[in-house]
């Protein structure tokens, strides 16, 4: 024992003197030295390495380093070091290098010499220069001779302007990330050499206007988190290939006009200032900055006319007060639509003439008024009623979130009367104050949380085979026994959370498919008797007035998860816990 104690200092010194590269994980062609405390390039590594990871270390330079054995290296990751200097002599020893990741270093220092050294990297296809405090001219100098470059990451720098000649030497660039900079200006012709460019990320910048957008070959464009008030595309004859466009978190006042963007499938306009979807509503005085391009706005053409392939449209978090149904008629491929968190008060079916005023409100033929939407999000608006024609015009609707509105479900006393009450009607009865959720045959998932619903009427969901129903947050809600009639064989998930219901207000029927039930945040002292025939797998009864779960738990063979906290369970009646 004494001998081991005597030898311990020598053993520890030997461990400290080991080369840091011995801590690396190595295979024949791949080596990872992430975060092992390296202060210099590990030249002692073996021959034939193609993939080398050196991120999260303390390497400061790659200058005049003799690096034998790295002639086969194709991938080098040096992100999150302290790198500030490189030499052509060193980089010339990496003739096959294709991916060079240098994010989060100090390449703003010595950028002239470093950029000159980069000229020997003739085979570089992927380059990461993110988070290096690079200004516009510095970034341009680094890539000034990289003719093979395909993917470039310049995010998280200090670029304020994209100059006309910045990308002159990188004609094969396909992906460009300029997010999280300070870009305020894009000079005319800045992207002109990039005829193969497909993906551009300009999120988190300070761009106010995109006019004459002419990158017809682009497929993905992210302009979120800017200060955009205006977005217009070039009115040329060549169609655009753009498929994904993100304009969220800007200051757009109107739906952008995209007359030639026929292939667009995903459009995100959330978190803007759009107050109207009506054609011809553009006013110069609404804009913070003056734009000469305002005169190009077409005041009669619907901006959605060309978007025949659009599948996903997000207009949430805007200022819309009206849901003009006909605005979406030309979107024949639309599957997902969100108008959540607006100021919607009503839905309107009218067509528009002269670009401004509602025309004849009489019903249009069904094939012209139906939308192909499968998922509709209208939560957090001010809707008080949805007319019968609304659901009739959405024959493919499967999922809808109508939470945080003021919608009251209508009564339907059985299938025959429910059909007579409006199954085939296109015009709501004047003075309607409730919304018919019956006879919606494709609807599977419905959320009515926080709608101030106090009572469900009998057969409210007749001929609507719901799989999930959210009625949470409707304080003092009453659910009489017949309210969930016709859902006995379909409903799998039900939430009645936070309704302050006692057992007299929760008369659930025998729901033979119910697997998930949330009853938390009520005043139940007894569980609904109808649950005895439900194959429950998950039950949440937290924060109620229950003293026992009794026979429900002891007889259930399917129950896997029960949440019980916040109930005054009696210590003398906990025998069911052993079952």
What is the predicted role of each segment?
Residues 30, 51, 72-75, 85, ...:
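Conserved LRR concave beta-strand detector
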Residues 39, 60, 84, 108, ...:
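Leucine-rich repeat
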Residues 44, 65-70, 88-94, 112-121, ...:
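A structural signal for leucine-rich repeat
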């Amino acid at each position: 024992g004494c001998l081991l104690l005597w030898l311990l200092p020598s053993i520890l010194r030997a461990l400290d003197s080991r080369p840091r590269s011995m801590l690396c994980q190595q295979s024949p062609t791949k080596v990872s030295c992430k975060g092992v405390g390296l202060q210099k390039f590990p030249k002692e590594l073996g021959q034939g390495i193609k993939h080398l990871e050196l991120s999260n270390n303390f390497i400061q330079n790659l200058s005049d380093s003799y690096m034998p054995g790295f002639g086969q290296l194709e991938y080098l990751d040096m992100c999150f070091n302290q790198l500030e200097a490189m030499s052509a002599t060193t980089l010339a020893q990496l003739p096959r290098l294709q991916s060079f990741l240098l994010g989060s270093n100090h390449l703003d220092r010595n950028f002239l010499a470093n950029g000159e050294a980069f000229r020997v990297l003739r085979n570089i296809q992927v380059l990461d220069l993110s988070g290096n405090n690079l200004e516009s001219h510095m970034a341009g100098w680094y890539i000034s001779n990289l003719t093979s470059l395909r993917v470039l990451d310049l995010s998280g720098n200090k670029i304020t302007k994209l100059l006309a000649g910045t990308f002159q030497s990188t004609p094969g660039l396909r992906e460009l990330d300029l997010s999280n900079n300070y870009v305020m200006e894009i000079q005319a012709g800045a992207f002109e050499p990039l005829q193969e460019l497909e993906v551009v990320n300009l999120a988190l910048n300070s761009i106010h206007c995109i006019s004459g957008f002419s990158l017809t070959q682009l497929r993905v464009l992210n302009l979120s988190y800017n200060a955009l008030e205006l977005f217009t595309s070039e009115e040329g004859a060549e169609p655009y290939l753009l498929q994904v466009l993100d304009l969220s978190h800007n200051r757009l006042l109107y739906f952008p006009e995209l007359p030639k963007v026929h292939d667009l499938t995903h459009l995100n306009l959330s978190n803007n200032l759009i107050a109207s979807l009506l054609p011809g509503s553009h006013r110069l005085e609404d804009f913070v900055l003056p734009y000469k391009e305002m005169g190009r706005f077409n005041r009669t053409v619907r901006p959605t006319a060309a978007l025949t392939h659009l599948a996903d449209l997000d207009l949430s978090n805007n200022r819309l007060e009206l849901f003009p149904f006909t605005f979406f008629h030309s979107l024949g491929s639309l599957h997902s639509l969100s108008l959540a968190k607006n100021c919607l008060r009503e839905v309107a079916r009218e067509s528009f003439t002269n670009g401004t005023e509602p025309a004849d409100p009489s019903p249009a033929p069904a094939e012209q008024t139906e939308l192909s939407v499968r998922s509709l999000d209208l939560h957090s608006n001010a809707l008080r009623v949805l007319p019968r024609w609304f659901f009739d015009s959405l024959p493919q609707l499967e999922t809808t979130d109508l939470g945080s509105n003021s919608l009251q479900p209508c009564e339907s006393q059985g299938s025959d009367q429910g059909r007579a009450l409006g199954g085939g009607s296109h015009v709501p009865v004047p003075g309607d104050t409730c919304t018919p959720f019956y006879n919606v045959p494709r609807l599977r998932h419905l959320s009515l949380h926080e709608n101030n619903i106090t009572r469900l009427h009998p057969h409210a969901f007749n001929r609507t085979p719901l799989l999930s129903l959210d009625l949470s947050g409707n304080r003092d809600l009453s659910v009489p026994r017949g309210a969930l009639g016709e859902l006995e064989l379909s409903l799998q998930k039900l939430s009645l959370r936070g309704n302050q219901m006692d057992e007299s207000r929760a008369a659930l029927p025998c729901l033979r498919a119910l697997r998930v039930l949330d009853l938390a945040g009520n005043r139940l002292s007894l569980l609904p008797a109808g649950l005895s025939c439900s194959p429950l797998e998950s039950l949440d009864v937290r924060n109620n007035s229950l003293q026992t779960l009794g026979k429900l738990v002891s007889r259930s063979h399917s129950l896997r998860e029960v949440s019980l906290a916040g109930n005054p369970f009696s210590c003398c009646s906990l025998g069911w816990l052993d079952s």
